[in-house]
Amino acid sequence: MASFLRFRLSASLKPYITFGRMLYTRIDKDGLTMLAGHLAYVSLLSLVPLVTVIFALFAAFPMFADISIKLKAFIFTNFMPATGDIIQNYLEQFVANSNRMTVVGTCGLIVTALLLIYSVDSVLNIIWRSKVHRSLVFSFAVYWMVLTLGPILVGASMVISSYLLSLQWLANARVDSMIDETLRLFPLLISWVSFWLLYSVVPTVRVPAQDALIGALVAALFFELGKKGFTMYITLFPSYQLIYGVLAVIPILFLWVYWSWCIVLLGAEITVTLGEYRAQRHQAITEKSPSQSQEI
């Protein structure tokens, strides 16, 4: 009986073990940590230009003033844990200084911001082993759309949430508590949708929607857990402040950006491996069927 249970258990776990091995092999072959380090470096170079371009676009349209404020609070609270206030102060100073830049300097900012999106595009297509290249005009259009429409859609969704909370018929204890619990999941939902779009749109090959959704969900869950774990580490083990002093925000920001890219690329690797695992199983079944028919 015990041997039968062990056999059933090993048989039920075999697909997960096989998938785990395939995933580990792929991560090791692609050099996930090196790719994440590359993106972290480019992100730090592009962070100020990216934030400057985004909020300059909001400033150009007065109707987006409320969205800009809500989006700032959302980004620094949910995407830069524990050090959001300090980094926000520095970035706001940089953005204020950029207003005095010339046209050439402004174009340089935009190019640097687009460089990050180009790097993400290149790395994801390396993971997908894609050899298809988009035209320069199409790529620029996609990058510009991501740069402009992405923050606006996130900010608009937050404004809609605030509007729903202000409605009179929702001023009810039970409904209010339900909405409060739902809004707690809002950052997770935003991360999930963002990662799903990233894995679906950026690669130049067709990505099954189901695989992209699963990979994006895993990445979003790890991202939310990573935020809590990172905040806990900074709060409980503040020894980095004794070493770096006032410069402590620099290594903290770099570590968080690096960890975030590791999570994003892990979700991409899971998405790709799901498709490869399915293809491998289909091939095994196809090869097994003719041999069975010959025996008959």
Swiss-Prot record:
Location of this chain's protein in the cell: Cell inner membrane
Q: Name one Pfam family in it.
A: Virul_fac_BrkB
GO cellular-component term (any): plasma membrane
User: What is its membrane topology?
Assistant: Multi-pass membrane protein
What parts of the sequence cross the membrane?
44-64, 67-87, 108-128, 136-156, 185-205, 212-232, 246-266
What's the protein name?
UPF0761 membrane protein YE0031
Q: Keywords, A to Z?
A: Cell inner membrane, Cell membrane, Membrane, Transmembrane, Transmembrane helix
Which protein family is named in the record?
Belongs to the UPF0761 family.
The answer on whether this UniProt entry bears the keyword Transmembrane helix reads yes
